[in-house]
Amino acid sequence: LPNPSGFVTCLSSISKSVYTPAINLKAVIADPVAKTAVVQAGATLGEVYYXIIYARVLWVGNTTQKLEWIRSLHDYQSSFFPFFSA
């Protein structure tokens, strides 16, 4: 299964090109069979809560490749197991 720390690296690179606020990993839902995962991240600007961001990523070995941003988990319906809390 993907290492949750890999998502931090992935989100960090994504946020630099999309958002200026810091991105904090909240949860990971991974599908090891399809080698895909959905990340849920909270963006903060100082102490102010900014937004919830979802991104679908593809795992390639120990690295991640961003596929697309999704508005919510409802936009990517599937049976994701297991559920990781970070």
From Swiss-Prot:
A Gene Ontology molecular function term of the record: oxidoreductase activity
Glycosylation (residues): 62
PTM characteristics: Carries MUXF and MMXF, two complex N-linked glycans with alpha-1,3-fucose and beta-1,2-xylose residues in their structures. MMXF is added to Asn-62.
Cofactor(s) it depends on: FAD
Record keywords, A-Z: Allergen, FAD, Flavoprotein, Glycoprotein, Oxidoreductase
Domain of life: Eukaryota
Family that this chain belongs to: Belongs to the oxygen-dependent FAD-linked oxidoreductase family.
Entry protein name: Allergen Api g 5
Species the sequence originates in: Apium graveolens
